[in-house]
Amino acid sequence: LCYIYELVSYLCFPDILETEYMRSHLLIGAASSGSGKTTFTLGLLRALRNRSLRVQPFKCGPDYIDTRHHKMAAGCASVNLDGFMMSEGHIKDLYARYTSNADVAVTEGVMGLFDGYDAMRGSSAEISGLLRIPIVLVVNAKSTAYSVAPLLYGFRNFRKDLNVVGAVFNFVASESHYSFLRQACED
């Protein structure tokens, strides 16, 4: 949880993530399903709520189970943003409406960041690009260390219009394991 609180502190600086919608928002993405996006998102939502911030959760895609968990953690209904079923205009309108009274918005991605119905259509990357939401990647670090460097590099550079601002490592085995992962980020 200490990493969640570091991220919460980052979100509380109003100049860092300002866009046309609101000051602070993030999309929680990953390289694949099973990386820990939902668990991390729920912890982040609760940590932000515990700081007395008005948190608005969103979920990429048509998922109805994660949105129920979001509601319990954030204290308000989570809204689906579905690039396959909704027009770009509708997604923008929903996002603007639901973030208008929020201090911070957290959008949980679906599957891997670039996975969608037809290439990237309906993907988390599509939503991030459309709404200009910075991305934090949740990385499954089990059985890997410095090899995350090219993974992170690829995610940061695959689409220059997206803003990958950080990574959270899940399944970290020890302090020395974490030091390898941190070095990979810095390089």
Feature names for model-found ranges:
Residues 171-187:
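GTPase G-domain guanine-specificity segment
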Residues 20-35, 39, 45-131, 139-166, ...:
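ATP-dependent carboxylate-amine ligase catalytic core
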